[in-house]
Amino acid sequence: YYCIENRLKDAKGFGEKSQKDILEKAQHYLSSKGKWLYGRLEPILKDLEVALNSSEITRFQLTGQAYRKSQIVDEVIYIVDAEEWPVYIEGFELNDQDDDSMIGVYKEELLVTFLLSVEDLSKEAFIQSFSEDVAIETLFDISKLPFGKDNDRAIFEALNLPYIIPELRWNQDLFHLKGEELIKEEDIRGVVHCHTTYSDGIHTVKEMCNYAQDKGYEYIVITDHSQSAFYASGLIIERVVQQHIEIDKVQKDFTNLKIFKSIESDILNDGSLDYPEDVLKSFDLVIGSIHSVLNMDIERATTRLVKAIENPHMHILGHMTGRLLLSRKGYPVDYDKIFDACAANNVSIELNANPQRLDMDHTMIAKAVAKGIKISINPDAHSM
């Protein structure tokens, strides 16, 4: 209220800039209410579907954003078949109900909408599985969609169309991709960007390596925080040396797993990396990331990142915009300049797979790949 009324700037210790920053953060927080990270939503949906299977609902199909596994979901929709609306669904509290829909809250936190199937459940869920940005009428004649199919894969087959996985149904330009061209879990050969107890991870180097070996991986890249990240117990130079000695020792216990020595080096305010050259040279791989002084305009952020990318010891640009989905907007960057710098310096870009980051944004990946840039899909793991 005080920001909107332009009053906070007059309070001691505040000014125009801080008032604007606080207002933007408050507006971002308010606009995020009721929205979910898919990574947090998924286990709740599994529990809900167990409850639905125990109710009077005979068939149900998740559709919309949640079915597409969108990184942010602001509505959860099920198409259902039922003789009548169930009196009880375990964990579900009814808010509103009419002949066609039922809305309520599951486990006191998740707003769910159930839509009663009017004509054919699979057909209706199929149509709603596409983003509003997709012109589905250019793909098939809606009036000729088949009835009585068990699932959307069967509908694609009946239309004599290649199957489009739900995750791609947000962008018509991606529909040419076939299932065999997409990354599957069994394609994962190793993991990059793994923190340990040396910084802010939960498990030791050896515990992380044991887990990687049990998963059948060929390599693991141990990547703790650098010295400027004091809040995350970042490694001073002596600790770097200590960790490298330990990795060499642990490596002797793993004949089928290669352990790489890495660091998530802070990109400092002037764009330099967080160690002198002789220390940077000791790593097999350097990921450079910004963790501090995030309030930047596009010119300052881009200049800072490009300088880091041009450092000869930099291998991967980590979580490029610094965003935390539903919590913090990322700083703006000039993607063209960043991509050109990465291509010129053979620096890969991280797709940070932490559900709260997913940074860089998936919408920019095709453009980066077109410039010959490799994408490193990393867990940013802090535990096994």
What are the residue ranges of the model-derived segments?
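Helical scaffold of the NTase/Pol beta-like nucleotidyltransferase catalytic core
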Residues: 1-2, 7-61
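Non-catalytic positions within long, well-ordered alpha-helices that form the structural scaffold/packing
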Residues: 53, 209, 213-214, 309-310, ...
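Distinct, well-ordered alpha-helical segments
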Residues: 269-279, 305-306, 328-332, 360-370
